[in-house]
Design a protein with these regions (language model features):
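Alpha-helical transmembrane segments of multi-pass small-molecule/ion transporters
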Residues: 1-314
Length: 314
């Protein structure tokens, strides 16, 4: 049971920080804009610094591990499953169905993924390939479909510019570049007087992210749109149950992973839906409550299934 114990200790750490954020919001500490300030600072400053600091010192061949194949195909398959279910049962319009597919496959590699990778899996660099994959592949595809279905046209310029609006992706790519250069020349090329402050700022990312998430729980009640209830629970089940099962099958039978690698693949597949999905829904003003509720319920149920995974595989 060491895997379960490690997972529970990790969730205890994460839960206490989230609860601190929730209490701070209830007591109105920091004022009404505190959550936004924490979110924006962590998104634009702390998290990119963290990813740069981690990846720049990670061996280049360990960053792009073959486990990315599992993450990619498990996400694609679960997205296809939602689209099939929508065609058979929900009959949502194309734009709403796109939000549903993203709700089902898009991992919260930052707000929840970084803390879980840090405190449960012991290696925050594990989320980097997933982050790059989502921002470079799934985000452009999703935004292209939303452009077509809501505007009737594709803005190629906006799609191509999207990665430039993602500080996490930029920080990750810069870290990967430094790792590659360091491997080439045989020593770490960033002097400590530059690396140390970047690393120091990056260390603030996880607590800020978790407290901001805790603050977000003090807000409007979920499931106000009753027509979305079946779809909301469906995307939560797809995200937290079906996707980890697919990841296990691919990891074990196709890729031949065992031990810590198998465990990490399945745990990361059980991460809740990324909050980016709500940002995309808000940008196109489509499926807002659906996106928010899907994220909330996948986030609330994710620890349960990660604990089960820890019992079975940890």
């Amino acid at each position: 049971m060491p895997g379960l114990l490690s997972a529970m200790e990790g969730f205890c750490v994460i839960g206490i920080v989230i609860a601190t954020g929730y209490v701070a919001a209830r007591m109105r500490i920091g004022g009404p804009s505190a959550q936004m300030a924490l979110n924006r600072f962590s998104f634009f400053v702390s998290s990119p610094c963290l990813m740069f600091a981690i990846l720049s010192k990670e061996k280049i061949f360990e960053i792009f591990h073959s486990s990315i194949v599992v993450a990619f195909f498990s996400a694609v398959l679960v997205g296809v499953v939602f689209l099939i279910l929508n065609r058979l049962f929900f009959h949502m319009k194309a734009a709403d169905a796109t939000i549903g597919a993203l709700n089902s496959l898009y991992l919260n590699s930052n707000n929840i993924g970084l803390p879980i990778a840090t405190y449960i899996l012991g290696n925050p660099a594990l989320v980097a390939p997933i982050l790059v994959m989502q921002q470079a592949v799934f985000t452009p595809i999703g935004l292209t479909v939303l452009d077509v279905t809501t505007k009737g046209k594709v803005s190629a310029k906006e799609i191509l510019k999207q990665p430039l609006h993602q500080p996490l992706l930029i920080g990750s790519l810069l870290g990967i570049a430094v790792s590659a250069i360091s491997a080439k020349v045989g020593f770490f090329v960033i002097p400590s007087c530059i690396y140390d402050p970047i690393n120091m700022i990056g260390n603030s990312a996880v607590p800020m992210i978790l407290m901001a998430f805790g603050m977000s729980l003090h807000g409007p009640k979920p499931l106000q749109d009753k027509s979305n209830v079946p779809a909301v629970f469906t995307v939560a089940a797809l995200k937290n149950i079906v996707m980890p099962i697919i990841a296990f099958l691919l990891s074990y039978f196709v890729m031949g992973f065992r031990g810590a690698t198998l465990y990490a693949c399945v745990v990361l597949a059980a991460l809740p839906t990324g909050q980016n999905v709500y940002n995309y829904a808000a940008r196109y003003n489509v499926g807002l409550s659906f996106a928010r509720d899907g994220i909330l319920f996948s986030t609330l149920s994710s620890p349960i299934f990660i604990a089960i995974i820890a019992v079975l595989l940890g």
